[in-house]
Amino acid sequence: TQRYAVPMFEELANSNAPVRLHSPNGLHVREMTPETALLMKRAGMVTVRLSLETSSAWRAVKDFSGKVSADEFNNAVDALFSAGYTSRDVGAYILVGLPGQSKEGVNDTVEFAAGCGVQVKPALFSPVPGTVEFERAVEAGMIRENDDPVLQNNTLRTIDFWDDNGDGYNEFRRIINAANSKNL
């Protein structure tokens, strides 16, 4: 952040260029300080997406989401709101369909993110070869190690997480919509 993003934001903020920036990928919450949030706002960043992934305790124990603690996430959100961003501007990506993840764990993460005042943006887990989560997905029988990557993609595995008749997915969408409507 300090090496690339901050100098870029400083240059944009000082130029008064009429830009509207959006972060389509989740930003790392540890890098979100009050100073950085204010600089982003001055530079023209209008849509901010944070990387939460999961707030489940079992993931933290397994060293998956050690990069984001609840306090760090709250601090990042507070920094953004203090800089002038609103709930409409800030969203958090959460992962759905991680090996061993329960629907209750996903719902807890939705509640946590919404409770922080941000929009919840679910993303389906897609294992990347060579990562710990890929190995966990193989061990859990979600994928086979030597399968074509297209067969490991989240698009083909979506039904694995929901019940077969689609009611589970529809209920999840209802939960997401209800959570997000609180922060409009």
Report each predicted region and the residues it spans.
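C-terminal accessory regions of radical SAM enzymes
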Residues: 89, 104-184
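Conserved beta-strand segments of the P-loop GTPase G domain that flank and frequently precede/overlap
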Residues: 94-95, 123
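Short, flexible micro-motifs
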Residues: 54, 69, 100, 133, ...
